[in-house]
């Protein structure tokens, strides 16, 4: 399989080549583990930054802005037109995900977003 792999880590090619039942189980395991830890880590990092630098404005969240910038810098991107669109989309997705966590007080939405939505972007 060549091309874009949303959950493309070092073992993804081996998992895909392992046959139908094992590839489905392996990809599900990768998505759940990756989604849980990345979503949960952004929620924790955002909370720590907000406890240190609280904002009085409802829609300004320093932790969410920082996490969105970190997410953009940690993941590969390009400076083409579609690369810029992807950067803007990523910023909106991460900022929105963390603002929803702030409004609801529930970090499980961050895990859900990374398990199901983020891997499709």
Identify the meaning behind each predicted range.
Residues 23-121:
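Transmembrane helix-loop-helix hairpins at the membrane interface
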Residues 2-24, 51:
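Membrane-interface interhelical connector segments
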């Amino acid at each position: 399989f060549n091309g874009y792999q949303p959950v493309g880590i070092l073992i993804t090619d081996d998992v895909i080549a392992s046959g139908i039942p094992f590839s489905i189980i392996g990809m599900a395991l990768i998505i759940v583990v990756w989604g849980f830890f990345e979503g949960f880590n952004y929620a924790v990092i955002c909370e720590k930054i907000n406890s240190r630098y609280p904002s009085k404005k409802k829609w300004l969240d320093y932790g969410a802005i920082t996490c969105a910038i970190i997410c953009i810098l940690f993941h590969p991107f390009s400076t083409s037109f579609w690369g810029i669109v992807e950067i803007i989309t990523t910023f909106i997705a991460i900022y929105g995900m963390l603002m929803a966590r702030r409004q609801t007080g529930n970090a499980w939405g961050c895990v859900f977003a990374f398990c199901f939505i983020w891997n499709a972007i």
